[in-house]
Amino acid sequence: YKLEKKDNGVFEIFIPGIHTLQNGQRYCAIVVHDGKELDRIPAYATYVVQDEKDHSWNAVVHHMEDPFPWTDEAFRPKKTVFVYECHIGMAQQEGKVGTYREFQENVLPRVAALGYSALQIMAIQEHPYYASFGYQVTNFFAASSRFGTPEDLKALINAAHALGIAVLLD
């Protein structure tokens, strides 16, 4: 199927028999360049994952039945900022990539106990090459899936705010 370009620069498609994309469904765009088909992740994807078998990257349809339950409406950052800079994947003792949930459970309480008022999370956007330290970004609107789901990151932010800690995303 070919995308149709609209007057406003947006491309769209209607596929007969397909009424909606399903939650969890993976997708990508196939671009033809110099006669070759190239798989591309849409620039505005908000959740991107890597296939464990063939290591390809795809966008994922990711919408929740109910909105995320933010609990930080009353949060206001402190006037004095004392920043704890961290990398979620490296902030643990085990020899594996850490997760948002592990950070929330194991590191965040120590950050609060030490009196930090802000958490600067490094390399948060999706990037395919882990050794790049997260600075070869491929998807600016997607948090790195190797650390967990978007809801896991939101839960970490809620927990930080509950402890009086502001969150900065690098």
Where are these regions (language model features)?
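Beta-strand-rich binding/interaction modules
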Residues: 1-2
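Aromatic-lined carbohydrate-binding/catalytic grooves of carbohydrate-active enzymes
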Residues: 110-155
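The substrate-binding groove and active-site-proximal loops of carbohydrate-active enzymes
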Residues: 87-102, 136-150, 166
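Short amphipathic alpha-helices and their capping/turn segments at secondary-structure boundaries
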Residues: 71-74, 105-115
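Hydrophobic faces of well-ordered beta-strands that scaffold small-molecule active sites
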Residues: 82-86, 119-121, 167-169
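Conserved beta-strand->loop/alpha-helix structural units within folded catalytic cores of enzymes
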Residues: 154-170
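The feature marks proteins involved in alpha-glucan
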Residues: 5-85, 90-95
